[in-house]
Amino acid sequence: MPKNIAIVTGSMRPNSAGAGLLPMVQAAVEAADMTATVVDIRTAELPFFNDSHTPSQEGFAPSDPAVQRCAHTVATADALIMLTPEYNGQLSGAQKNAIDWLHKEWHNKPVGIIAYGWHAGHGAQAQLVALLKRLKARPIAAQGLTFLQDISTSGEPLATGQAQSSITTLINTIVRGI
């Protein structure tokens, strides 16, 4: 049975670079003989975190069906890829909210980060690595893609081939880390 990689997007924008990159990431996962499952933040309908209990509390079980679906996808994945934009040097609030809804689901999960933006998503990468380590996940690889150098602002790869190379390198690292 092929390994399952969950890809968690990070932008609510319908024309985001992440939406443009997602098919390339999915294809690269499938080319590595793995299954790609997507948690699309834009369509997942996750509410802002508003539970009276924290996910780190013993016995926490979210009651919202959208959160339950997200939790199940993360919990059953063999590894994850965080496809995240960088907004003002930070990870997106929508992706942070999705992360905040979960706790034990992240434990010991290998995670790769594909960040994108004007500065290759370095600020978002650093935040995600720190946050994922705090949640006891295993961030094992990160790649940054720069607008107008590696990808267009809509996520289309530029002729350099850097985007595809970076994504393939990240996925190969994840395969070794599972």
Language model feature labels by segment:
Residues 1-84, 90-97, 157-176:
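N-terminal beta1-alpha1-beta2 submodule of the flavodoxin-like/Rossmannoid cofactor-binding fold
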Residues 4, 106-108, 155:
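Glycine-rich NAD(P)-binding loop of Rossmann-like domains
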Residues 28, 103, 131:
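Hydrophobic/aromatic ligand-binding patch that stacks against planar heteroaromatic rings
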Residues 39-50, 134-155:
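Mobile beta-alpha loop/short-helix "lid" or hinge segments that flank ligand
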Residues 88-89, 120:
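Glycine-rich nucleotide phosphate-binding loop and flanking beta-alpha elements
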Residues 92-108:
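Rossmann-fold NAD(P) dinucleotide-binding segment
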Residues 107-148, 162:
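Short, glycine-/small-residue-rich phosphate/pyrophosphate-handling segment
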Residues 132, 136, 171-178:
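Structural signal for hydrophobic packing residues in well-ordered secondary-structure cores
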